[in-house]
């Protein structure tokens, strides 16, 4: 699991998230990454980056988990993350958003866009309003056809493991067909995790979850890269909806694993992949606005 540590305020949450989703059998499972921009590096920034890496290693060491610390020069953060994923064969990336962050919207727009285009690995974008280990419930909104994505069973495993470790219930919301597949998978592989399943008739009904998600709950929204099997144009409205109705909740948006190398993933909706940038840019701009509000 790759953890970029650009923001010292999100490091603890990201490392703790990685600790509860990682496979206990995997050795050297965590890689902390500090990217130094080729164009505007300074000694001060390099020192801060080093401190960030050390902080990540210390938090994981408390749980007796080693961290590989990587500092690299690259053109930008997205490029640094993508290169490190390849070099260290990372299977997942967790990115943090601080609730009071004030980041330039084009920066996050570009980061999200470049990262999701540049890797087919699972990407989690997380914002925590409280420490990970104090969460009382995990609510997961799952879109139709999510069961056909190659990363389906992996993200289910991650959150069932998280629920088991934290001792909290994992509550899945999906349409009937997807819910049936979720129930089969959980029964077969994660029977020990306390789970609950509720019908979410239409993906548009996501807003009905406002009554289900308390302050000490984590809301996980399963999304998908543009052009993938479960991608839906309504995902473009997600940012605005989440920002408006779930701004007081800890939140993870997850983009599951996909088959093939990034450039091989052709779009079902549009083989030429038009409008992809537009979509990710919207997500990026929304994150910026949302973060400024909180």
Feature map (PLM): residue ranges:
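Terminal export/targeting leaders at protein ends
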Residues: 153, 238-240, 270-272
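Structured cytosolic domains appended to multi-pass membrane proteins
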Residues: 1-213, 219-228, 255-256
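Short conserved micro-motifs at the rims of enzyme active sites and ligand-binding pockets
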Residues: 14, 231-233, 263-265
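Charged helix-capping and loop-helix junction motifs
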Residues: 108-110, 234-239
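C-terminal functional regions that serve as terminal interaction/effector modules
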Residues: 217-218, 225, 240-253
